[in-house]
Structure formats: C-alpha cells, structure tokens
Amino acid sequence: MSDDIAALPLQFTDAAASKVKNLIADEENPELKLRVYITGGGCSGFQYGFTFDDQINDGDMTIEKQGVALVVDPMSLQYLVGGAVDYTEGLEGSRFIVTNPNAKSTCGCGSSFSV
C-alpha cells in the first residue's frame, strides 16, 4: 500500500504497529495480521473487536506498517472511516484503542459506541 497516509480511510499508528509486530513475533507466525471489526452489542449499540487472523478475505482493506498488517472488513470500515487504531499503556492497563470521529457517543468502557 502507498505511503500516502492522508489517502488512507483508517490510520494505523506507529505504537499499534509496533505492538502488533511484537505480538506476532511472540506467536512465531509471520502470517498473522491484526483484524479490527465492529459488531452489534455493548452498552452503546456497537463495539470494537480485535483478533489476529492469518486470512485476508475478499473486500478486506489492508494497511501495512513496520512490516505488519491491519485488516478491516468492508462492513466495519464504513463505521471507521477517518479513525485510527492505536495502542496505549497506562494505569488502566494496555490495550488497542480506536479513535472514531463517526461515533456520536461512547461508553465509559471505551469499546462501545453509537453512530
């Protein structure tokens, strides 16, 4: 994929890519990719999910950074356009987070939102 990050509908931060790279190295499976997806549920109607996947399905968007890939299915992508996948470590623990400008409201847990 091009290095023109302004054209990407979803940003994959350096911190997230670095953590994915470390986790994939721990799993000893270089075919793994971080998949971000949205499902119905949570206290605000939708929730974010993350999983490692070794498959890329038809229609998936792939963003590569630091030699690792973030994969998003087309249905989830429509809710994530303009957002970013990041990784943070703090007093609350460490986790992947989504910054989503399309979310009209979010829940205190940070993984649930409404549009």
Swiss-Prot record:
One of its GO terms (biological process) is iron-sulfur cluster assembly. InterPro entries: FeS_biogenesis, FeS_cluster_insertion, FeS_cluster_insertion_CS, FeS_cluster_insertion_RrpA, HesB-like_dom_sf. It comes from the Bacteria. Its cofactor is iron-sulfur cluster. GO terms for molecular function: 2 iron, 2 sulfur cluster binding; 4 iron, 4 sulfur cluster binding; iron ion binding. The keyword Iron-sulfur applies. Iron-sulfur cluster binds at C43, C107, C109. Belongs to the HesB/IscA family. Homodimer. Required for insertion of 4Fe-4S clusters for at least IspG. This is Iron-sulfur cluster insertion protein ErpA. It comes from Pectobacterium atrosepticum (strain SCRI 1043 / ATCC BAA-672).
